[in-house]
A protein has these predicted regions:
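Short extracytoplasmic
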Residues: 63-65, 71-105
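Charged, solvent-exposed interaction patches on well-folded alpha/beta domains
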Residues: 1-54, 61, 81, 113, ...
Length: 290
């Protein structure tokens, strides 16, 4: 017998990284069968799909009538032409973007909206540009907004609102080429708007009315009607002869007319301070018989 201690056997080591194995009991899951709630949801989806198909396929919702709202100055025929390509299409499937683009291209229209009124009516609502003047060229009359855009040509049945707007007569040669969609010079629009807003009372005149005329020879003129004097305001530019001298010219005109209006044939208003007038020719005395 030796003095050595007996060695104990070590338990076997697990391989590195080996996961501990646990036994788990199998879990029984509920069957994914068709419950009443799920069946109801499926039925609702099917009914919605059939309803959408029915609306899209039914001719009862085809575009057949047009209703226009907000059109004071806009020609209804222009609106009709803009939406005519959609005639007969289903209103629920209608793409409105191309129609809105056509409507907004009408000069009198600033913006437009499209809606529907069942069963088959397309509703077009217009936001119109605001006209500030009537621009007369020969026998033609055009609505003009504050940006100088010729919005619409007025016919014989112009709306009452148009008849209340101040008017400008354009006798310049280049105005013969004007038409709807043309944009006037901003300086001309500014001068015309200022002058066309004047009334006889503002310049102490007894004239029945005042007419603003744009000419090639003298620029802007103010004519007292019927058969009165002519005040020559002249040409205006953005820098050299600005329209902000017009209020001073108007005050000068009132002073020159005071007490002598019936004697004046024409007045030239060079600026706010310098103005001259030409009197009417005195009637010649008739020859006395011998």
């Amino acid at each position: 017998m030796t003095g050595r201690m007996p060695m104990r056997a070590r338990p076997p080591t697990r391989p590195a990284g080996a996961a501990s194995m646990r036994r788990t009991r199998p879990v029984k899951r509920a069957s994914a069968g068709l419950t009443p709630v799920r069946a109801g949801a499926v039925l609702a989806m099917l009914l919605s799909a059939f309803a959408i198909y029915g609306v899209g396929a039914s001719p009862a919702f085809d575009f057949g009538e047009l209703r226009i709202e907000g059109a004071t100055y806009t020609d209804p025929d222009a609106v009709q032409r803009s939406v005519e390509p959609a005639r007969g299409e289903n209103l629920f499937l209608l793409s409105t973007a191309p129609l809105l683009a056509e409507l907004r291209a009408i000069p009198t229209v600033a913006d437009a909206r499209i809606g529907i009124a069942l069963p088959g009516t397309l509703v077009v609502t217009l936001d119109e540009r605001e006209p500030v003047l009537v621009w007369k060229v020969g026998s033609q009359r055009y609505l003009v907004d504050r940006d100088g855009l010729l919005l619409e040509r007025l016919g014989d049945n112009a709306p009452p609102e148009a008849e209340q707007l101040p008017a400008v007569v354009d006798e310049r040669a280049r105005s013969a080429s004007f038409g709807v969609g043309v944009r006037l010079d901003p300086v001309d629009v500014d001068a015309a708007t200022r002058l066309a807003s004047l009334t006889p009372a503002q310049i102490s005149s007894s004239a029945g009315r005042l007419a603003v005329v744009a000419t090639d020879d003298h620029g802007f003129e103010l004519r007292a009607q019927p058969k009165g004097w002519t005040a020559i305001f002249g040409f205006y530019t953005p820098s050299l002869r600005r329209t902000d001298i017009i209020p001073g010219q108007v005050r000068l005109l009132a002073r020159l007319l005071e007490g002598r209006e019936d004697e004046i044939a024409s007045i030239v208003l060079a600026d706010e301070h310098d103005g001259t007038y030409i009197p009417k020719p005195s009637p010649r005395s008739s020859a006395k018989p011998e």
